[in-house]
Amino acid sequence: MGIEDNSQQPNTGSPYGQSPPSQYNPYGQQPPQQQQYNPYGEQQQQPQQQQQYGYQPQFQPTYQQPPPQPQYYSQAQMPFPPQQQQPPPITNLNKANDRESLIGGVGGGGIPPNNNQTMVGSYNEGETKFAPPKYQDIWFSILFGLNFGLLIVVSASAFAKTPYTYYDSNYYDNTSGGSFGFLFAILPFTIVFSLLYIWAWLKLAANHAESLIKYSFFGAMGLMIGYCVFFFVWGAIYLGIIFAIMAFFIILFYISCRSRIPFTATLLSNAVAIIKEYPSVIRAGYVSIFINFVWFIVWGSAFARVNMVYTGAIQTCINIYLVFTLYWVFHVIKNTLHTTVSGLLATWYFCSGPNGVGMPHNPTLGSARRALTTSFGSICFGSLIISLIETLRYLSQMMINNRNVVVKIIGYIFNCILSMLSSIVQFFNTYAFTHVAIYGKSFCDSAKSTFTMFENRLGSTIINDNFVGTTIAIGGLVASLLLSILGALISIPFDMSVYGGALALFIGYLVIITNLEVVYSSTISLFVCYVMEPEVLAHTKPQLYQLYSSTYHLR
């Protein structure tokens, strides 16, 4: 990522920019009669110990240095790749205190630079050298705004009409008192339990990530085998066969790839440590929950009103549009959170550490600002693609519900194809949005970078993603089961055990899965940064780089 000097020099000369300050005084600080240079290639040779690239004392560029080249990364000036030997290996990696000192917070291990040395590419220098970030894919931001305007028009026209169906507003009056007592009992318990569960899970992930990943996979195997036995006993042979195949592939994947668990565990521990250092990223997740909650209320009101006042083809067309809008807004909110988290992790990766340029003030807010301004068009673009696929799946579901057998079969085929396509696109988009957050590029350019990464690291990406995804999914599943059981028990005095279990499951799942999604985004962001820019980690946090490379060798 640094600037390379393409000028040719004799092999006897010192590396460019690494001569001691006594050899050349900075230009403009000599008497007029002394401002001259020796002929090209005839510099006076002095024996010296070669310094690390990027740590010249009081070095200023000469006229023969090429001008700075434009770079994509717009968050801060990244240090130049180190031209040095690898740091010495770390001993006693199994000690908890050594490991925590490496992966915790804004540290990263290593020897701090000498105070007399000047860091090339400091944070303030990057602010003046690089141009302001450019707005990417702005037309999709405009299209997203126009879609909201159309939603307002459709909703206003629906509420202006008289409903065809009469609803008795007093139907549920006799249950209102019991419902309030039921809610006051369920909500505090669910929120407190969810927060305690998240605290325990993060503690376990920070200190015993490898064991957490292994036991999560054992839980997934047991769950699939349990479903298989249940459906065979129940008589649903086909479902039993499906779950047996799923159990077989999970076991095969674990046996084949279990040697990669230490690397994923290192990434997971590192991600949790960074989240603890910057807890505002968790608050960003709660903000996304609130926005989604408000959006579902607004959308649900519009959807219900449309189905009260319209019938026939008009009702069908408006419903399809509303479903598309539901998916688009939901994915925009979700991907904005992911991009915010990835931006924070990228800032930590490139700027923190003893040899780094230093973290900016409130990096989470800065990352959120970029996601909502310069990168918002790219987020809308990528979210639009997956929303169109999900809308087509909704249409295929309508075909499945058709009475015509041929249409029903075609609907099943389309639904299967679109389901697989949706999973692939969502997987791809997750890493594309990570590139958007790291480099600030457009969605198309980020997609090209993601393709390039997949060409070289697709196997490692899938393995790492599966380990992290399975760990988070099992964590969310265990919490959901506990919440549903406890919620049902608490609701027995109100004769609402079913509703209590369902409500506790819904609210608790939202709180828990939001925190776990932040952990997921953090882990894969560290993975992308490492496989794309390993030399930066070796320069800014050499001992953490040694820890990464000891568990995963980039080939």
From Swiss-Prot:
Task: Give the record's glycosylation annotations as residue positions.
Answer: N116, N174
Q: Which UniProt keywords apply?
A: Glycoprotein, Membrane, Transmembrane, Transmembrane helix
One family name in Pfam for this protein: Choline_transpo
Query: Mind telling me what this protein is named?
Result: CTL-like protein DDB_G0274487
Renumbered to this chain, the Polar residues biased-composition regions fall at 1-17
Q: Which GO terms describe its cellular component?
A: membrane
Q: Which cysteines are joined by disulfide bonds?
A: none
The keyword Glycoprotein is annotated on this UniProt entry: yes
What organism, scientifically named, is this protein from?
Dictyostelium discoideum
- Protein localization: Membrane
Q: Where is this region: Disordered?
A: 1-101
Q: Which GO terms describe its biological process?
A: transmembrane transport
Q: Which InterPro entries match?
A: Choline_transptr-like
A Gene Ontology molecular-function term? transmembrane transporter activity
Q: What is its main location?
A: membrane
Q: Which family does it belong to?
A: Belongs to the CTL (choline transporter-like) family.
Compositional bias annotation for Pro residues: 79-90
Signal peptide start and end residues: none
Q: Which residues cross the membrane?
A: 138-158, 182-202, 210-230, 231-251, 284-304, 313-333, 340-360, 372-392, 405-425, 472-492, 493-513
- Recorded topology in the membrane: Multi-pass membrane protein
**Biased composition, class Low complexity, residue ranges:** 19-63
